[in-house]
A protein has these predicted regions:
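Divalent metal-cofactor coordination and adjacent catalytic microenvironments
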Residues: 1-113
Length: 113
């Protein structure tokens, strides 16, 4: 499993921060990175970990980022009570179906045998 999303201006804005916000200290940036990395691991674990290129596909990447950002933001703001949002769960369901389709196209089956 490989994480490749970074705490960029887009993710900072998702969390309500401006890119050069004075309120962004090293601790906040580290929490952002941890939340985003954990969200990626969660999403990939929920969908499938075998095909890392799947998540970088131009048709998949926007939904993948949206799911990771939604979960990462939730965990950033509510670390002790965070659960996945309904939106993130719906996106994961869509991505799981797309992942299965790509595995069938690639291997002829979704099974790992």
């Amino acid at each position: 499993m490989t994480t490749f999303l970074t705490v960029d201006d887009e993710f900072k804005r998702t969390l309500g921060y401006l890119p050069d916000d004075d309120l962004l200290d090293d601790q906040s940036l580290q929490r952002m990175k941890s939340a985003l990395t954990a969200a990626e691991i969660y999403v990939q674990g929920a969908i499938g970990e075998e095909n890392e290129d799947f998540y970088k596909d131009e048709k998949i990447l926007p939904l993948y980022k949206l799911a990771c950002y939604a979960i990462g933001a939730n965990w950033f703001f509510h670390p002790s009570t965070a659960v996945s949002s309904t939106t993130a769960k719906a996106i994961i369901g869509q991505l799981r179906a797309s992942y299965d389709e790509s595995e069938v196209a690639k291997n002829g089956s979704t099974s790992k045998s």
